[in-house]
Structure formats: structure tokens, C-alpha cells
């Protein structure tokens, strides 16, 4: 709430600029911003450095406030710092506001739907994780409340958890509130791998929100989606509602306010809501969303946020105990990689992922509780892509497939690992029925007949003899295997599975 003193609007910080927060460290430059009287000299002091600016002349709201913002020099010393902002009021007096216990580190946005919202208390080994949280005072956490708006808003409409130092209390909040398990575990693992570098984690998720609600309508339209469509959006505690896709309801409230803040990167766990909604457009909408977020952050922070900031995601897991089921999850996993099969790739730069289709849990839930494995895989790829660390971060990736017409075998060569860990013989299928292969019943298993270093040889079934091979696929099932029993893993890090694969000849 704004405050008036004898007719004066007093300065305040934007509502997510708080005590205990994390600001982006050097080499990037952080931004501090807030509201106050229009056209007033505003001074910021941090340690022995003083900055000045003039608040904007134009009003931002009906409260008579305008925006002020100050760009700090790059700060590599983690702190903690106290920050003081002083503004001259209309009556000539000075008014000072302060931030305390501010650290400088890497700021990560954690977004998506309910699998990102799923709290530490909801996962396996929650008690141990929560009890140990106090060992990480240099990790700071913040959770946004799920709100909607027709138009972009500068400030958050609701906050579930103010900036907090990691502790059993701040990490062990109620179910599906705070702290996001994937966000926390990813941040903790990055923090430990980077020798205790301070990490700020902003959890801003909206359960059941399709990807179309996370970007503006013109971007959705670029992918050939009609803006007359509506999306079912269940909001906890309220009747189920339909919202129009022509409004970026969730982006406006959950992401846009942070685009004035300099960040290091983003992680994303979403896709289930698109399992039956514009699934065929997901490769386009996902790529466009990443591009739009990056452009918006870069523009609104005056080029201080990297135009290609790292973007990590969790590839969809499982939900069924039926090993033969093939639903929209199978093709959506492929679309999550922009139809390449793996990331990083050349379609969208600096993107990384965690493969999770082997982490089967409760067959009736979309929310697997093995979030430690999810975060481990995501943090390994984050270290490699976002931090340029020389770590193994993915399972075997297909580099080439060789097949000659009339042959009874297919050779698949992999890259990125020293050797391949074969856990069983199930997972590959082929289709020899030409263009009719869109029918899943026409695909038949192909067995591994030999392995030589990084090359696997498949023997085709008798139904393919004398016919041309049309398609090859791997792990093309909603739930392709028991827990951690997919066919292919890295031999040197056996918690890194090979992702699903699809090829047409």
C-alpha cells in the first residue's frame, strides 16, 4: 500500500524488493527499483557507493506514484549488504527506506505448472531435506501467489512467501505452496557444485496452466493458434473457469513483474496441460515463449539480462502403469526438444533439460515424488550449459543411424558418453509400412543383436523383411519402463538416461 505523509507520497520499493533478497552478481549489474513522488531526486547508498537518479515524471498509478530505478555497478562481493534509498518529498523533507541482509549471487526464476509448484514437503525424503535446509544460509527463496490479470502488471498481485533465508521453516511450507521442490533442489545442487555461490530462487508457477497463457496473444498467433480458443484453467479454491487464449493471463502476473529484475536464468516444468491441448503446436509455442521471455527481460532491464539467458526444463515424466499406453505425452516430450530429440541444439540456443520418463511413481498421479533425481539431472545439465562446467550431463545421444534398403539390421551410433549402460532389451521399435506409420499398431519391436563401443545393432523383425524401413523410435510410451529401468543410460553416470528418439527414413 502507498502511504501519504501530509500530502506527500513517500518512496517505497517494488513489492518483491525486500530484506534478505538476492540480487544478480557481477559481471552483470543489478537493478533496484520502486515508487515515489514524480520528478524527484532519488539517492541510493550501498556500502561506500552513492547513486542518484530522478524519478519519472509520468504517473504509474492512481496513487500519484511514479517509478524510480537505479542500476548498480557490478558487485562480486556477495555481502550481506544494507541498501538505503532517500527521496526528497514535495514538502522538502527527506525520507529514507532501507533493505537489510541483501546478498549478491545468481538469480534463477522457477516456473511452470503444478510439478514446479509441488513443494519439498510433498516429495520422497522430504523430512531430511527440510531438516538440512538451515545449512544453506546463502540460498534465498521467494514464492509468488497464483493470480491472473488481463493486462501486464508492474508489481506482483500476491506473494505467498517473502524473501527468506533457507531454513526448515522457509523450505518446509505446506503442500503445494512453498518451497517448490524442483526449484529448491536445483538451486541447492547448483550452490554446492559452485563452491557455495549465493543463489536466489524465485518460484512463480500456476497449476494446470497451458503454455499459451505464459505469452502474449501475438506470439500464440505466430504458431497458427486461433485467439478465439478458450483454455480450461482450474484455480484452487474457486470454480473451474474457462479463460480466453487471447489474453496472457498468467504471464501478465507471474512473469512480467520480474522482467525489471536482472536474472541469471530460468528453469521450467510444464507441459501436462498441453497433453490434450494444441499438443501439435508445442514445439512452436515453447520456442516462441523462450524467445519472448528472453527478449522482454533483455529489453526491460536495458540489456543487462543476457538476451540468451540459460533456460532449463524438465521433460515430461509418466502417469500411467500401463506399459503399452501411447498418449500425447510421447509426442509432447519430442516437441519439448523442438523436434530434435535432445538439447542443447541449434533451434533455440542455451537450453538444457532433465530426462524423467524413467522415474515412474504413483501410476495415478502426474506428480512423481522422485524430485531429487529430477533436480540432479537438471542441475548437471545446468552446470554444463549455464555455467560451462566440464561435467557429464546427459545420457547417450544419437549421432547417426545407418540402414540400407533390404537390410535386416539398423546401426545406431551414440555420442557424449564414454560407454553405454544397457539395462534391458526393450525400447526400440520400427515401422515398415510406409506413410501409414502414424498408426501406432503398425510399429513392431526391434531387438538389440550386438553392441560395439558406442554403436548398437538392431535386428528387424520378420514382418520387415523385404520391405523398406520407414520409421525408428525409442521409448515411445507414456510409461516405457519400471523405475530407472530404461534400456540406455550413460555407463559413467548411471543416473543419466538416453532421451526418447524418433526418426523417419
Say what each PLM segment does.
Residues 2-505:
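Cell-envelope and extracellular/periplasmic
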Amino acid at each position: 500500500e502507498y502511504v501519504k505523509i501530509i500530502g506527500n507520497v513517500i518512496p517505497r520499493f517494488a513489492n518483491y524488493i525486500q530484506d534478505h533478497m538476492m540480487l544478480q552478481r557481477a559481471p552483470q549489474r543489478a537493478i533496484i527499483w520502486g515508487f515515489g513522488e514524480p520528478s524527484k531526486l532519488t539517492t541510493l547508498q550501498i556500502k561506500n557507493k552513492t547513486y542518484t537518479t530522478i524519478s519519472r515524471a509520468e504517473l504509474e498509478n492512481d496513487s500519484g506514484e511514479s517509478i524510480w530505478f537505479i542500476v548498480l555497478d557490478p558487485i562480486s562481493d556477495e555481502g550481506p549488504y544494507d541498501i538505503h534509498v532517500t527521496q526528497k518529498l514535495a514538502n522538502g523533507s527527506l525520507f529514507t527506506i532501507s533493505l537489510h541482509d541483501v546478498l549478491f549471487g545468481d538469480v534463477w526464476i522457477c516456473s511452470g505448472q503444478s510439478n514446479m509448484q509441488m513443494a519439498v514437503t510433498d516429495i520422497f525424503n522430504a523430512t531430511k531435506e527440510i531438516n538440512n535446509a538451515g545449512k544453506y544460509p546463502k540460498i534465498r527463496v521467494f514464492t509468488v501467489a497464483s493470480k491472473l490479470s488481463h493486462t501486464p502488471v508492474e508489481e506482483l498481485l500476491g506473494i505467498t512467501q517473502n524473501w527468506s533465508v533457507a531454513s526448515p521453516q522457509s523450505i518446509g511450507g505446506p503442500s503445494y505452496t512453498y518451497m517448490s521442490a524442483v526449484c529448491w533442489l536445483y538451486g541447492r545442487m547448483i550452490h554446492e557444485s559452485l563452491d557455495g555461490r549465493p543463489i536466489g530462487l524465485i518460484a512463480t508457477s500456476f497449476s494446470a496452466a497451458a503454455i499459451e497463457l505464459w505469452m502474449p496473444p501475438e506470439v500464440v498467433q505466430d504458431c497458427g493458434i486461433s485467439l478465439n480458443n478458450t483454455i480450461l484453467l482450474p484455480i484452487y479454491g474457486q470454480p473451474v473457469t474457462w479463460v480466453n487464449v487471447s489474453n496472457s493471463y498468467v504471464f501478465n502476473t507471474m512473469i512480467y513483474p520480474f522482467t525489471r529484475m536482472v536474472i541469471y536464468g530460468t528453469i521450467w516444468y510444464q507441459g501436462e496441460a498441453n497433453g490434450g491441448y494444441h499438443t501439435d503446436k508445442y514445439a512452436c509455442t515453447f520456442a516462441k515463449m523462450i524467445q519472448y521471455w528472453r527478449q522482454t527481460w533483455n529489453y526491460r532491464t536495458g540489456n543487462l539480462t543476457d538476451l540468451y539467458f540459460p533456460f532449463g526444463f524438465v521433460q515430461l515424466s509418466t502417469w500411467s502403469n500401463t506399459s503399452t499406453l501411447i498418449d500425447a505425452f510421447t509426442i509432447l516430450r519430442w516437441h519439448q526438444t523442438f523436434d530434435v530429440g535432445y538439447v542443447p541444439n541449434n533451434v533455440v540456443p542455451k537450453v538444457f533439460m532433465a530426462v524423467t520418463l524413467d522415474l515412474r511413481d504413483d501410476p495415478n498421479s502426474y506428480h512423481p515424488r522422485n524430485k531429487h533425481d529430477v533436480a540432479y539431472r537438471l542441475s548437471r545439465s545446468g552446470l554444463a550449459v549455464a555455467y560451462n562446467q566440464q561435467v557429464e550431463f546427459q545420457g547417450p545421444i544419437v549421432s547417426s543411424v545407418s540402414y540400407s534398403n533390404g537390410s535386416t539390421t539398423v546401426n545406431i551410433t551414440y555420442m557424449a558418453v564414454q560407454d553405454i549402460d544397457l539395462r534391458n532389451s526393450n525400447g526400440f521399435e520400427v515401422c515398415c509400412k510406409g506413410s501409414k506409420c502414424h498408426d501406432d499398431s503398425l510399429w513392431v519391436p526391434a531387438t538389440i543383436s550386438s553392441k560395439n563401443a558406442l554403436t548398437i545393432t538392431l535386428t528387424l523383425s520378420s514382418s520387415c523383411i523385404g520391405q523398406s524401413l520407414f520409421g525408428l523410435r525409442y521409448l515411445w510410451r507414456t510409461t516405457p519402463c519400471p523405475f530407472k529401468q530404461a534400456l540406455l543410460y550413460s555407463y559413467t553416470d548411471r543416473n543419466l538416461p538416453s532421451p526418447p528418439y524418433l526418426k523417419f527414413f
